[in-house]
Amino acid sequence: MEGKLFLGQYLICVILLLGQLHGYKSCIEKERKALLELKAFLIPLNAGEWNDNVLSWTNDTKSDCCQWMGVECNRKSGRITNIAFGIGFIIENPLLNLSLLHPFEDVRSLDLSSSRSCEDCGFSGLFDDVEGYKSLSRLRNLEILDLSSHRFNNSIFPFLNAATSLTTLFLTYNNMHSPFLVKEFKDLTNLEHLDLRGNRFNGSIPTQDYNSLRRFRKLEILDLSDNLFNSRIFPFLNSATSLKSLSLWGNNMGGPFPAKELRDLTNVELLDLSRNRFNGSIPVRALFALRKLKALDLSDNEFSSSVELQGKFAKTKPLSGTCPWKNMEELKLSNNKLAGQFPLCLTSLTGLRVLDLSSNQLTGNVPSALANLESLEYLSLFGNNFEGFFSLGLLANLSKLKVLRLDSQSNSLEVEFETSWKPKFQLVVIALRSCNLEKVPHFLLHQKDLHHVDLSDNQIHGNFPSWLLENNTKLEVLLLQNNSFTSFQLPKSAHNLLFLNVSVNKFNHLFLQNFGWILPHLVCVNLAYNGFQGNLPSSLDNMKSIEFLDLSHNRFHGKLPRRFLKGCYNLTILKLSHNKLSGEVFPEAANFTRLWVMSMDNNLFTGNIGKGFRSLPSLNVLDISNNKLTGVIPSWIGERQGLFALQLSNNMLEGEIPTSLFNISYLQLLDLSSNRLSGDIPPHVSSIYHGAVLLLQNNNLSGVIPDTLLLNVIVLDLRNNRLSGNLPEFINTQNISILLLRGNNFTGQIPHQFCSLSNIQLLDLSNNKFNGSIPSCLSNTSFGLRKGDDSYRYDVPSRFGTAKDPVYFESLLMIDEFNMVNETNSQTKIEFATKHRYDAYMGGNLKLLFGMDLSENELSGEIPVELGGLVELEALNLSHNNLSGVILESFSGLKNVESLDLSFNRLQGPIPLQLTDMISLAVFNVSYNNLSGIVPQGRQFNTFETQSYFGNPLLCGKSIDISCASNNFHPTDNGVEADESTVDMESFYWSFVAAYVTILLGILASLSFDSPWSRAWFYIVDAFVLKVRNMLWQNTAGTKCSYVLVSLSSPSVVVLLKPPALFHKTRT
């Protein structure tokens, strides 16, 4: 009986199959030829990036076009119904000939979108020389038209308006602009789905068009996202009462939430207003009018209050912990400024599937009432300031939960879990960052479907959890950085893991040699800041998909494996810095044809710069500084026109700087400092990148500065070389931001062009031979007046990012994709002297430092009073010059100065009391001048040591423990010139020299006689010398280098002694 039944079923199936085959027809010849004509039209316009669709269309009469890729036909009529062209990179912005589409009379769906979205590619318009604007009316059954990612503008609307049968129209990411006029497609009344996202529509809609959307009674989905609309568009949208989905993310909307303007959209189920600038409170009650609302996205705005979410209302009764959104399924409020505790009313939304409150300022405890949300699939609370204890056991009954993301920015949240706990859910994503975990949660042993695990920034210790890989064959992302793991182990069999980050742990053992065999599919690996030892494993060459590899800050040693250099051809970023790797660097060609960034600094590499670097055509950043490289810099490096940053500092490179380096078009950072380079700076450097950083300090460079060198650089460091001559008179003052010339042999006066340094931040001209006066116009320089201007960056960033769309469950809203972004900064490091010491500044600290150092030169004259106007200056050093006059009262305006050094000059008069207003002053030095009067007291002056005033015998006061009551001190009022009784030291020196020579000759003449009168003569000379010495101690402040005549007890010995080392001018 069963056999007969089976036979009957089999016969029925055969009959049905034969019936279908009998009814099937192949494509119509006219349409086959039309497809080939379309192909012939499109191919010449393409830059070679087609998918397989059009390429599969062959001119073979035996080939059924209904079987071609991208083509679908009606099985009965044989007519084409759907065409997806798969257009690639269209060049020169041609027009699309619509007449080529006319043969497809029964087509229902046309996909003419481009697979490439760029600013200058794709079709720019439509045309039909015969039918004109009515061309698309020939396609009477056309329902779906996709013209996305081209350069179409508003001129195509008259053509589109003729396609009255359209129900779905995609015009995303084109070049359409304001105004947005509905009358342009007023006849498309059958539209159900209109997508205009990614254009340039802006402004508001004319008042007369406010009700124009009413004619589109079938319109259910409208997407105007990623345009430039403002909030005045809402009265216009309020008339589209048939809408079920409205997306306006990424526009220019601001102000309070437009609840009143949206009150008539009672059919809306999805509302996306994310990535705008709405502020104020989220109007829970006002949104109650949208009774059918299922998905609401208000993320990435500026909402700052969750008062209504807390169930607290003015003039109304409280919600008593109940939200009025009974149909809500998905709610995204992330990346706002919501403060206060977790909104408890949300825990009453039992139908909620997605809840995202991440990246706000919520505090307090994570509520246990989350257990009420039994439909929850996605819960994201990371990026807040939750505190206290939270037990994961409270979520045990959420059987549908797939994504759990939780952390605490304040690191005050402690997540607890029971050892024996076995939840009902099977997670796909778990992220528990900064949750004070000390071990991997035990319940993960029961999770078998994990794709993404993030337990970073905790205190987990012990072995690397290789069992996570063994239990979860679909695991793609494993992030365990910044923990305390001590033993790195891997499973025995290969795994499909894509992203691994175990940086900043406490691994301190030999690295696994089978790493590349067990994890062959890795795309991104970060093992930095550990203690891994041994040679780099040759198995790394098995990771054919690897793009980002960071092994820096470990203890790897030995040479680079040859198999590694030949095998990982997809590498984009390679970081091997701060290890003990040795041998030559790239002596032969490597297979890193896609490599952008290579960091090999702080190792033990030796020998010449290898020719293998010539095989890296895509290289943007090369850092092999702080090694032991020798030889010359090869000129062929200049062939790498894609270089952004080249860092070769702190090696033993010799010879001259190749001129070719300055011909690299986009070179932003060139660091050749601390080598043994010699010769002149290449004279023709005008082609260097605009805004470049050039670091050549600590070499043996000689000659003069080329006139063209300063045209484009923003940072120039030439300190401690052998450069000489005058500074170039022409300087592009709009660019230079940091100019450091210390420790050379420059002469002449400070050029007046320096007064126009509109972006200067650090200026160091110290330890040279500049003379003349300090230009008073230096007060016109910026020195921090543009500190809010972020137009200059001293670092060269290189970003590596990989995004992965979450396919863990279906969502009405855009769920945040997984981004693994690694940024490598080629940092500019600058040393600058402040507070009597050299400190290194880089990154954000460098951008906040403003200083001027003119010390150790031969500058003379008075200090310009205008320097007191440099109000943002933080360090000023004028020491070891021949400056005269008084200390400026205007210095009191330097409120930000932390270090002021005026020592070893010839300044006189009092220290102005107004200087006590310099509230930031930490280091003050006026030693070895000719100052007089009372040392000010109060504020910062109470903290300065007596050494700050040495060599000024006429100063007195409590700060230096010298009483001002003695008759020897006659304080001078501020603003009064120096005491007329002060010895004219210059005249005194000349008279002293003449007297000294006369006496010396007399002494030498009498040395041959030994008589009572000669001994009496020596006693008289002793007394005279003692008197002269006392006078010198009181009046020689400000002299740089003096000699004191001292007579010893022996009448026949007279010596010259230098003053103590404290008196001496030092040159560093």
Swiss-Prot record:
* Keywords from the named record: Cell membrane, Glycoprotein, Leucine-rich repeat, Membrane, Receptor, Repeat, Signal, Transmembrane, Transmembrane helix
Cytoplasmic side of membrane? 1008-1068
Q: Which positions, given as ranges, span the membrane?
A: 987-1007
Q: Which Pfam families match?
A: LRR_1, LRR_8, LRRNT_2
Each LRR repeat occupies one of these ranges, namely: 104-129, 139-162, 164-187, 188-212, 216-239, 241-264, 265-290, 292-315, 325-349, 350-373, 375-397, 398-423, 424-447, 448-471, 472-497, 499-517, 519-543, 544-567, 569-594, 596-615, 616-639, 641-664, 665-688, 690-710, 711-734, 736-757, 758-781, 846-870, 871-893, 895-918, 920-943
Listed InterPro entries: Leu-rich_rpt, Leu-rich_rpt_typical-subtyp, LRR_dom_sf, LRR_N_plant-typ, RLP_Defense_Trigger
Q: Which residues are glycosylated?
A: 59, 97, 153, 202, 279, 397, 471, 482, 501, 570, 591, 663, 700, 735, 745, 771, 780, 822, 877, 882, 925, 930
NAD keyword on record:
no
Q: Which domain of life is it from?
A: Eukaryota
Where is the protein found, in the record's own terms? Cell membrane
Task: State the annotated membrane topology for this chain.
Answer: Single-pass type I membrane protein
Q: What is its main location?
A: membrane
Kindly indicate where the leader peptide sits in this chain.
1-23
**Extracellular topology: which positions?**
24-986
Q: Might you report a single GO cellular component term?
A: plasma membrane
Tell me which PANTHER family the record gives.
RECEPTOR-LIKE PROTEIN 14 (PTHR48062), RECEPTOR-LIKE PROTEIN 15 (PTHR48062:SF7)
Q: Which family does it belong to?
A: Belongs to the RLP family.
Protein name per UniProt: Receptor-like protein 13
Q: What is the source species?
A: Arabidopsis thaliana
Q: What does UniProt list as this organism's lineage?
A: Eukaryota, Viridiplantae, Streptophyta, Embryophyta, Tracheophyta
